């Protein structure tokens, strides 16, 4: 027995959009027929995009070919600027010489190459990555050049050896004693210090004697005061029953800030210090015996000598 499919009632379709409903018919007027569609009209076709052209392709018959490699930028710097100036001057000089040859060719005959030939580096040395500027000239004279002059000319046709043999530098001699500051630095008993070493010497409880001097202003007085101080220091260094004082010297022309801090305006001047405090200033030249008595008074509780001014002594703390 065959079964027929179940027949369902058809659903009414919805009204079409875009149709104006007719509410009623008027006498003598016929309804206008409107045709509408539910689907929108298709969009117009877009024009095709032009294909991009590469740099190596020709744009046309009239357009020249583009380079396949990017040109290197010119180097900038002192060397390149100097080379540009040299090229400019060289070009102008060549123009001047050319005009001179046109007017009177006999003037420059037999002169040879007036302009020096320009030295250029090879292509391998001038490539990037070598770290050197293009067109850099080679060294003029090598260190091991056999033609290097041993005695160079210092000007006006005078050799250095001839000048110093004729005008020798000699130390000043005072009272038959030669003033040799260079030897004093190496072999002297009084050490010369600078402002960086001052704190390590001053901030110490042991006795300290400072001589502020000048090498080239009143050199005789400064040298004599230094020699007397060395003799007095040797006396205490040779004695075994007491600790000798420390003795240093400061050049006023070199250590200006330190001399200003010590309030020293005239040289030579001797300062007696203890614990970063100035006990006494001696501005006059004293002999070694007088300095021994002054050191004993300030540091070893000895009797005050007559050469010490009691009013100039710093008061005790």
From Swiss-Prot:
The alphabetized UniProt keywords are: Chloroplast, Plastid, Transit peptide
Q: Which PANTHER family match?
A: THIOREDOXIN-LIKE FOLD DOMAIN-CONTAINING PROTEIN MRL7, CHLOROPLASTIC, THIOREDOXIN-LIKE FOLD DOMAIN-CONTAINING PROTEIN MRL7L, CHLOROPLASTIC
| Cited InterPro entries | MRL7/MRL7L, Thioredoxin-like_sf
Q: What is its main location?
A: plastid
The listed locations are: Plastid, Chloroplast; Plastid, Chloroplast stroma, Chloroplast nucleoid
The GO biological-process annotations, alphabetized, read as: chloroplast organization; regulation of DNA-templated transcription
According to UniProt, the name of this protein is Thioredoxin-like fold domain-containing protein MRL7 homolog, chloroplastic
Identify the species of origin.
Oryza sativa subsp. japonica
Q: In which residue ranges is the amino acid composition biased (Basic residues)?
A: 23-32
Q: Low complexity bias: where?
A: 1-10
Per UniProt, the ranges with Basic and acidic residues bias are 48-59
Q: Which domain of life does the protein's organism represent?
A: Eukaryota
Subunit-level organization: Component of the transcriptionally active chromosome (TAC) complexes.
Q: What does this protein do?
A: Plays an essential role in early steps of chloroplast development. Involved in the regulation of plastid gene expression. Required for the proper function of the plastid transcriptional machinery and protein accumulation in thylakoid membranes. May function as molecular chaperone to ensure proper organization of the nucleoids in chloroplasts.
The residues forming the transit peptide are 1-69
UniProt lists compositionally biased (Acidic residues) regions at 121-135
Stretch list, region Disordered: 1-83, 114-138
Q: Which GO terms describe its cellular component?
A: chloroplast nucleoid; chloroplast stroma
């Amino acid at each position: 027995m065959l079964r027929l499919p179940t027949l369902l009632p058809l659903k009414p379709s919805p009204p079409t959009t875009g149709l104006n409903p007719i509410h009623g018919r008027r006498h003598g007027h016929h309804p206008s027929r409107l045709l509408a569609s539910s689907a929108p009209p298709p969009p117009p076709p877009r024009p095709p995009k032009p294909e991009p052209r590469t740099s190596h392709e020709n744009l046309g018959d009239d357009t020249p070919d583009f380079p396949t490699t990017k040109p290197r930028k010119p180097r900038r710097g002192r060397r390149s600027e100097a080379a540009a100036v040299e090229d400019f001057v060289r070009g102008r000089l060549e123009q001047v010489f050319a005009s001179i040859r046109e007017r009177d060719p006999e003037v420059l005959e037999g002169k040879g190459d007036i302009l020096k030939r320009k030295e250029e580096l090879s292509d391998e040395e001038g490539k990037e990555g070598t770290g050197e500027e293009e067109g850099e000239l080679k060294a003029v004279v090598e260190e091991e050049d056999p033609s290097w002059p041993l005695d160079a000319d210092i000007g006006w046709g005078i050799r250095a050896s001839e000048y110093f043999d004729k005008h020798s530098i000699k130390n000043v001699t005072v009272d038959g004693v030669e003033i040799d500051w260079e030897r004093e630095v190496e072999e002297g008993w009084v050490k010369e210090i600078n402002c960086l070493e001052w704190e390590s010497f001053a901030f110490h409880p042991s006795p300290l004697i400072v001589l502020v001097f000048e090498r080239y202003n009143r050199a005789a007085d400064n040298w004599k005061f230094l020699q007397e101080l060395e003799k007095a220091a040797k006396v205490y260094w040779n004695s075994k029953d007491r600790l000798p004082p420390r003795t240093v010297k400061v050049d006023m022309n070199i250590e200006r800030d330190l001399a200003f801090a010590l309030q020293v305006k005239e040289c030579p001047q001797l300062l007696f210090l203890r614990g970063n405090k100035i006990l006494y200033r001696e501005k006059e030249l004293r002999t070694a015996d007088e300095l021994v008595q002054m050191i004993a008074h300030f540091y070893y509780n000895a009797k005050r000598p007559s050469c010490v001014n009691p009013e100039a002594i710093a008061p005790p703390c």
